[in-house]
A protein has these predicted regions:
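Secretory-pathway ectodomains
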Residues: 3-4, 21-25, 48-52
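Residues within alpha-helical segments
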Residues: 9-12, 40
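A short, Lys/Arg-rich alpha-helix, primarily the initiator
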Residues: 1-9, 45
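Short alpha-helical DNA-recognition segment
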Residues: 12-30
Length: 57
């Protein structure tokens, strides 16, 4: 998994559910997935870690 969209779809979440789960505005998720902005690497790794620990991916 190399992108936010990969993480989100692996967890079976919509953009809305993913944004609510992490407390990140939905528009930010849309911008990351659409390529308008880049998710910071440290944040991507933290989100991946949390999803793995929660057993969602």
């Amino acid at each position: 998994m190399n992108t936010i969209k990969d993480l989100r779809t692996a967890a079976g979440m919509t953009q809305k559910a993913f944004s609510e789960y992490f407390g990140i505005p939905k528009r930010t998720i849309e911008n990351w997935e659409g390529g308008q902005r880049e998710c910071p690497t440290y944040l991507f790794e933290l989100m991946k870690y949390k999803l793995e620990k929660e057993g969602l991916i």
